[in-house]
Amino acid sequence: VVDPGPPMIARLTYRFQPKANLGRDPESLADYEYIIFGGADPEMSIGPLLRRMLPLDVQVALRDAEKDLASWRKSPLRPLIEELSTSLDKDARAEIQEQVNEAQADLEGHAEVVATAERISERLIAIAGEQHAVPLTLGLSPTRIDALLRSLRLLIDNGARGIADASLGTANLIFMALKSLELDRLVTGCERDHTFFVVEEPEAHLHPHIQRLVYRYFLSTGADEEDTPPLTTILTTHSPHIASVTPIRSIVLLRHDAETNATTAASTATTPFSERDVADLQRYIDVSRGEIFFARGVILVEGDAERFLVPAFAEALGMPLDMLGITVCSVSGTNFTPYVKLLGPHGPNIPHVILTDRDPNGTGHPRVRRRLINVLQLREEDSSYNQLDADAVIARAKPFGYFVNSNTLEPELFIGGLAEAMQEVIEEELNI
């Protein structure tokens, strides 16, 4: 226990390190070992018994679900069939055996089946003679109950086709359903205090809407604490479709840190969002905005015009943004504050810049002044911003990557050398 709470917080530490008595620099994986201990104290060893009470079940990224489903050893159908086999009492087994025997007799006695078996026997006798030929019949094999149950296979389309004929996405969905049922059995078996279930890249071969449904299913498994078994689900993904429907405080971003040559984690769980921030982000983060979690850098702009023009300008300058891993994200307005909270040092800390209009306001301060003060106060606590004029605020914002034009987008484009092109578009669209 690292914090008695409430809520109480306990921590297990996994440390991968060079072997204690190595006596030299490690040269290969064989020179390393791992230790697991409680909290931050290496002396508080966590043994196998406790680890069995807190298992981590991982469903790896599905690459060939069809092959795994066809293999009795690997199939997630196996534990369900084995459970079925052990649940059958003597009377149920006898009833099934009688039904199988009747079906076997009907099949063996069918005239065409008998004729085919006789043809095979006659040819065998012709080749090897009656002394060496063995009696043959055609029938179902095996007929023992346990063997029959192991031969059960999942069928689709009302039994017309097997899993081998299903699409990759359908096979993956069936695989996940079976693994989920297997996990239910393990979790409710009273042999575990808590289970951590990791689902790796569930989006493989699935259409976007099904990706979202799969995610929402796993999200809902822990929604009702009264009826839900002790289970924590962790889902990893590269899908912006899933990211777009993820609760904004449920995101953990893993990135490579070049300076430390290590993987670092950043979470949105403690990001200082207001209720309005959460509502706005949850409402407006669609698939395109969901890309920001996978970007190396983000350019925040006001609207769709900038979202389309900025990549085109970058392409013309020989700097394709996709090649650089940079996403242009429209905030659909001028409220950049929730996005700066999301991307800033109190969140995943994704490098970002802002491109926004000055928006002159007659004799008053340009509207951009208050806009920039709001985001600058997130980056550094400084109450003196309110005493600065617009130009001073703009100058303070520039080192943070917050850039402002002289007016608004359209006049800037017009005087920036695009007047003729803009005129052509206007005339074409308005049929002038």
PLM features: what roles do these ranges have?
Residues 1-97, 101, 118, 369-391:
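Glycine-rich phosphate-binding loops of NTPases
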Residues 22-27, 246-432:
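Acidic, divalent-metal-binding catalytic cores of TOPRIM
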Residues 68-71, 78-199, 225:
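Extended helical coiled-coil dimerization/tether regions that scaffold
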Residues 57, 195-199, 299:
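Hydrophobic positions in the central parallel beta-sheet of the AAA+
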Residues 16, 60-63, 142, 156-158, ...:
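Flexible glycine-/small-residue-rich
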